[in-house]
Amino acid sequence: MKCFAAVGRSDVEDETAVHRHSLRKFQLWAGWDEIHDFILDDVALIDLVKLQKCLRAELTIQFCFQIIQKIHGNIIALERLKTAKKGTYLGPLRLLALEVYEKMHDCGVPSTMLTGQECIADDDSRITASTIEMADFSEEYDIAVIDEAQLTADPDRGHCWTKAILGLKAHEIHVCMSPAAESAVTHLIHLCGDSLAICRYQRKTALICEDTPFSFPESVLPGDALVVFSKKSVLDVAGRLEEEGIKASVIYGSLPPEIRRRQMQLFTSGKTKVVVATDAIGMGLNLPVRRIVFVQTQKFDGTTRRGLTVPEVKQIAGRAGRFELFDTGYVNAMGQESLDYIREQLTQEEEPIEKVSLGFPQILLDLDEPLDVIIKVWKSVEPTPPFEKVRVDEILSLYAQAERYRNDIYGFDDKRILYRMISCPIDIKDHQVVLQWLRYCKDYPADKRLKHPDKGAGSKLGLQKYETYYRKLDLYYQFSHRFDKIIDEDWLEQERSRTEGTIMQYLSKGKKSYIARCQRCVRMLPVGYPFKICDPCFRHSSIID
């Protein structure tokens, strides 16, 4: 395989300077109506164009059936990564980065794990395993692995995969994904002029959809993963299992990564017989699951409650029958109608992914207009297919929060500082975390260190309170890192450890209080029931109304 010649840093800087000059020149005569075309023609792909100049010799594209994380293709990619003098793994989850780090470490390969929340580094590290957002485009690698690349279409994070596929400087890149992403990802690679080899792998274990619908709790067996689509539903089902004397691990999106890992270890070691999870289980978590049971077949996607799509069903169902542990994986659902729906989805071909997410081009920050205006104008632009712009609603929401205190925020009028603030990844639905973020926006110039977050009194109790506090600890680390503040590493490690221990206590001491009950009559609701009021109470209220 031939080595590539990377373009020098000065070339990139020169090109950026040319575009900045054209931006300023453009502003002398163009109104905001005309800027749409300018963004499309000259700016929208500027970051990608710069990255395209770093050409690679060859890419190995691995298209794997249904779930890609632990089957043959991914194993080959990681085996190749072990041989690299300098290599990197990029994936969607901190847990996946940790898993790769531990595999390399256990094989005697000095490695580093790098995420937005922490860094663990061995001496003389050769391999960096990180979340996709932490990709380093200034480094030159022998081998790189980009995992779950079908997420190029994700409206929130997809631009990170787009940038990595186009911009990583490596002699050999393994891109692992589902078959549905083939057209979109190969289009990106052809933009660079890179050569590629496509390797397709099939699932090694059979996947069987059972004939008889699952009945709760009678049908529960060791090795089952019961899938629902909200944290409340996870704790509800786990509480019902507890009443039946069945110990269960729980996995959901807002659970801190270390707690997820501990819950997984309980299941893997056999200390819990069942796992109850949201669709977070579908994203590469390596668990000894014999059977996936869809307790729910509908999810709320932020806008509407809808049925699961073909890719969602296949991604989750594919967790059943772990390679080299079970010969066969099984899938089931509650009720005949739900089982028929899941069976139908499993037989359908996935629709090809046709969109590729495009990130906000920071070159636009040089425009002499307020930041929110620039972002809103960019948001209104329709890019050339297959590109689709990343969602910017959350950063606009944070901008609105910060604008209320603009006189108290040093650097508010500096668009690059402000963009660094509002693009900090936080849970904007957690009011306490947003308040902590605002405090950091106001206070960050005052000292070399940020103030430690507090647990807060508030109205939150128990588990929710400590999950929020953990998110505040993550924010402390991320904001400190973004603004080059000194991080109190010892304190942070101790606080994380204490908080993780407290959350584990809440999850282990009893979940019966989380069982869903009707808000009117307080009777226990049916398993997987999506509403807060039972049918009899709803019908009664309808008659009265």
Where are these regions (language model features)?
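Non-catalytic terminal extensions of ATP-dependent helicases
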Residues: 1-71, 360-545
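Conserved interdomain hinge at the start of the Helicase C-terminal
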Residues: 76, 81, 160, 202-240
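Conserved strand-helix element at the start of the C-terminal RecA-like helicase core
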Residues: 86-97, 174-176, 182, 219-244, ...
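Inter-Walker segment of RecA-like/P-loop motor cores
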Residues: 104-140
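Conserved helicase ATPase core of P-loop NTP-dependent helicases/translocases
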Residues: 113, 119-122, 236, 247-250, ...
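Conserved two-lobed SF2 helicase motor
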Residues: 123-138, 267-286
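Post-DEXD/H (motif II) to motif III coupling segment of the RecA-like Helicase ATP-binding lobe
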Residues: 150-202
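Conserved segment of the helicase C-terminal RecA-like domain
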Residues: 178-181, 287, 291-347
